[in-house]
Amino acid sequence: MRTIAILAAILLFALLAQAKSLQETADDAATQEQPGEDDQDLAVSFEENGLSTLRASGSQARRTCRCRFGRCFRRESYSGSCNINGRIFSLCCR
């Protein structure tokens, strides 16, 4: 009877240790990829002369580009990729 109690205690201790390591892994994964952070990593604005040859007035178009994890939003177009701290993101411009 004492042996069964000791084996049960060892089994419970092993399950508890495994549950803690799984929780730590889940917490690490949750802190690495928070929704909403993806579009805040990098924002780039620049002037582009591409439309000035088509317009007589010579006005310049302004584009705003962001590095996003995953796909671009509806009104954005994919314009390349970004490498930030070894992670690859989509360069999305509008």
Curated annotation (Swiss-Prot):
Signal peptide bounds: 1-19
Chief location bin: secreted
GO terms, biological process: antibacterial humoral response; antimicrobial humoral immune response mediated by antimicrobial peptide; cellular response to lipopolysaccharide; defense response to fungus; defense response to Gram-negative bacterium; defense response to Gram-positive bacterium; disruption of plasma membrane integrity in another organism; innate immune response in mucosa
Pfam families: Defensin_1, Defensin_propep
Propeptide residue intervals: 20-61
Top-level taxon of the source organism: Eukaryota
Keywords: Antibiotic, Antimicrobial, Defensin, Disulfide bond, Fungicide, Secreted, Signal
Disulfide bonds: C65-C93, C67-C82, C72-C92
Places the protein is found: Secreted
Gene Ontology annotations for the cellular component aspect, listed alphabetically: extracellular space
Family: Belongs to the alpha-defensin family.
Protein name: Defensin alpha 4
Organism: Macaca mulatta
